[in-house]
Curated annotation (Swiss-Prot):
Pathway stated in the Swiss-Prot or TrEMBL entry: Purine metabolism; GMP biosynthesis; GMP from XMP (L-Gln route): step 1/1
PROSITE patterns linked: GATASE_TYPE_1, GMPS_ATP_PPASE
Species the sequence originates in: Streptococcus pyogenes serotype M5 (strain Manfredo)
Active site: C89, H179, E181
Protein name: GMP synthase [glutamine-hydrolyzing]
Binding site for ATP: S233, G234, G235, V236, D237, S238, S239
Group of enzyme by EC: ligase
Residue ranges annotated for the Glutamine amidotransferase type-1 domain, each copy included: 12-205
Length: 520
């Protein structure tokens, strides 16, 4: 079966990207209902959408005003495709503006709303089926709709928003001023599910097995009989990519595992044992630790660290690939969240990701990124579907730059060792407490801060280690994990007693946002 025939057999809901940092959550929520969904540029044409043949279209939120000179628009023929359309926030305003309604600029009618608000449903609607007449939703808008287009009617309002939900059932056009994709909209999932299943008619039968078939077909079509080089980092993402690629192209895949001197304790041997031994991947192990650490000496800026590591990885691959024959592709474990955090055409860059930023312009390979439409929890599900053991699939997420971004300031062997040893203790105690599946991610950070302490009746002046532990569903938002005090106490006691050059432990209680998961 070709990639085209596989894709045509999969029902799809397309989300048009209008610039919200979290609009990809819309696609993620829809996938939870067993419906494939992905983001496309707002510049997509009606003809291009016809070729994709989606069963539904969502217009995402965004920071712009429909009146701005640089406002993101829409091909007007999209409204004539007879495909159900749901406009969210800016998307609703765009529908209104383009179809003859009225949108009032921010502040003119006291219409700004930020935070949770109560939605009052005034009429029944398939979109809100099974949800209460009054419900909490997350509003985040300045402009507001004050007159709706012909053929539309009011479904719901809020105290500060006269048109919080509208619809034209004859043309299957729906608009909501709030954000159902975020958890602060209590019945947001129900609303999106109603759109996908009841309005768009989705079967809800998309699964990771479908994804595997699609990606294998895509990889085989792209690669043909050529060869692929994969950089193994030791993390879940690159490991899953390796197994998927091997399933698709077999011995056309060569893996390079670069030991850059920034790995967790014993990680190099574990990677070789699991992937090289159990799964039979062809892995070349390269000890490039001195090469990386020399380049990183005295570098304090986190963006410079990422760029240096991203560049050097590719240069190492270049060196190794030159010893091989006919390698045309470089595979990476880039995820959806990596791309969004690195910025898109419509979204601001939060921080560059080592897989999508810092690559040199003269790179000799074409890129293959099989996971770049998946979120972290979906990658784990993919690993299980590929038959990978849980000890690999549930490995703690580990960034490509490794411990370089878990050491604040300049990197030294001494600092790296404090993080390796403290992180090993943290992971061991979390597992002993049976919390390793409940906590999304956990690791330690050398803060670069020294403080005075007393050990053995003597004065110390040593490093402060921070513990970071979070809970999350998809990695886009996160809360700090409320670890039991007795577990934290045991971890702290062990670290200060067993790890040299550490005399103080702190616990990071910051959510995302405003913080990111990693410190750098």
């Amino acid at each position: 079966m070709t990639e085209i025939s596989i894709l045509n057999d999969v029902q799809k809901i397309i989300v048009l990207d209008y610039g919200s940092q979290y609009n990809q959550l819309i696609a993620r929520r829809i996938r939870e209902f067993g419906v494939f969904s992905e983001l496309k540029s707002h510049k997509i044409t009606a003809q291009e959408l016809r070729e994709i043949n989606p069963i539904g279209i969502v217009l995402s939120g965004g920071p712009n005003s429909v009146y701005a000179d640089n406002a993101f628009g829409i091909d007007p023929e999209i409204f004539e495709l007879e495909i159900p359309i749901l406009g969210i926030c800016y998307g609703m305003q765009l529908i209104t503006h383009k179809l003859g309604g009225k949108v009032v600029p921010a502040g003119q009618a006291g219409n700004r709303e930020y935070g949770q608000s109560t939605l009052h449903l005034r009429e029944t609607s398939k979109l809100f089926s099974g949800t209460p007449q009054e419900q909490l939703v997350l509003m985040s808008h300045g402009d507001a709709v004050t007159e709706i287009p012909e053929g539309f009617h009011l479904v719901g309002d809020s105290n500060d928003c006269p048109y919080a939900a509208i619809e034209n059932t004859e043309k299957n056009l729906y608009g909501i001023q709030f954000h159902p994709e975020v958890r602060h909209s209590v019945y947001g999932n129900d609303i999106l599910k109603n759109f996908a299943i009841s309005i768009c008619g989705a079967r809800g039968d998309w699964s990771m097995d479908n994804f595997i078939d699609m990606e294998i077909a895509k990889i085989r079509e792209t690669v043909g009989d050529r060869k692929v080089l994969l950089g193994l980092s030791g993390g879940v993402d690159s490991s899953v990519v390796g197994v998927l690629l091997q399933k698709a192209i077999g011995d056309q895949l060569t893996c390079i595992f670069v030991d850059h001197g920034l790995l967790r304790k014993d990680e190099g041997d574990q990677v070789m044992g699991m992937l090289g031994g159990k799964f039979g991947l062809n892995i070349i192990r390269v000890d490039a630790s001195k090469r990386f650490l020399d380049l990183l000496a005295d570098v304090e800026d986190p963006e410079k660290k990422r760029k240096i590591i991203g560049n050097e990885f590719v240069y190492v691959f270049d060196d190794e690939a030159s010893k091989l024959k006919g390698v045309d592709f470089l595979a990476q474990g880039t995820l959806y969240t990596d791309i969004i955090e690195s910025g898109t055409e419509t979204a601001q860059t939060i921080k560059s990701h080592h897989n999508v930023g810092g690559l040199p312009e003269d790179m000799q390979f074409e890129l293959i990124e099989p996971l770049n439409t998946l979120f972290k929890d979906e990658v784990r599900a993919l690993g299980i579907a590929l038959g990978m053991p849980e000890e690999i699939v549930w490995r703690q997420p580990f960034p490509g730059p490794g411990l370089a971004i878990r050491v604040m300031g300049a990197i030294t062997e001494e600092k790296l060792e404090t993080v390796r040893e403290s992180d090993a203790i943290l992971r061991e105690e979390i597992a002993k407490a049976g919390l390793d599946r409940d906590v999304w991610q956990y690791f330690t950070v050398n803060t670069g801060v020294r403080s005075v302490g007393v050990m053995g009746d003597g004065r110390t002046y040593d490093y402060t280690i921070a513990i970071r532990a979070i809970t999350s569903i998809d990695g886009m938002t996160a809360d700090f994990a409320q670890l039991p005090w007795d577990v934290l106490k045991k971890i702290s006691t062990r670290i200060v007693n067993e790890v040299d050059h550490v005399n103080r432990i702190v616990y990071d209680i910051t959510s995302k946002p405003p913080a990111t998961v990693e410190w750098e």
